[in-house]
């Protein structure tokens, strides 16, 4: 359940949640509805705050503007707690049927291409009380703790998450790299 909780938060508050979750739990989720593009696809811009994550596909209209995203610690460390803090604004109510397409690569190797039901994840997990429908408006200082297992393999992970409404309108696109060094470094 922790994996799904993180993926839902990705859609709303940043790819930070996919940084840990797909790495520790790939293979969990629903059948793909729409395959995500490779990480870094389209134009990107940094998300304000302390994280390695960027908004992607910025030329497309998006229903979520992430105004701040912090990862503590940044970069994340295996065997420790990752605290994700985010603020943003949703411009349209998000209804049942919303989903998140996630792709995780280790270098050029694709580890995960998965679709997650956003509302189901929110119902099953505590993401600061968010449930569908998610009303339009500003959301400040949302926070989620994630335990990153010691067993996360070393390497540079490239993550892309695209969230869509039930009508396939883009909620957000987030991409980024996270490096986990070999143990002892």
UniProtKB/Swiss-Prot annotation:
SUPFAM superfamilies according to UniProt: E set domains
A molecular function GO annotation: phosphatidylserine binding
A biological process term (GO) from this entry: intracellular sterol transport
Family that this chain belongs to: Belongs to the NPC2 family.
Signal peptide range: 1-20
Sorted UniProt keywords: Lipid transport, Signal, Transport
Propeptide: 21-43
InterPro entries: GM2-AP_sf (IPR036846), Ig_E-set (IPR014756), ML_dom (IPR003172), ML_PG-PI_TP (IPR033917), NPC2-like (IPR039670)
Functional description taken from the UniProt entry: Catalyzes the intermembrane transfer of phosphatidylglycerol and phosphatidylinositol.
Spans through the membrane: none
A Pfam family the protein falls into: E1_DerP2_DerF2
Record protein name field: Phosphatidylglycerol/phosphatidylinositol transfer protein
GO annotations of cellular component type: extracellular region; fungal biofilm matrix; fungal-type vacuole lumen
Subunit field text: Monomer.
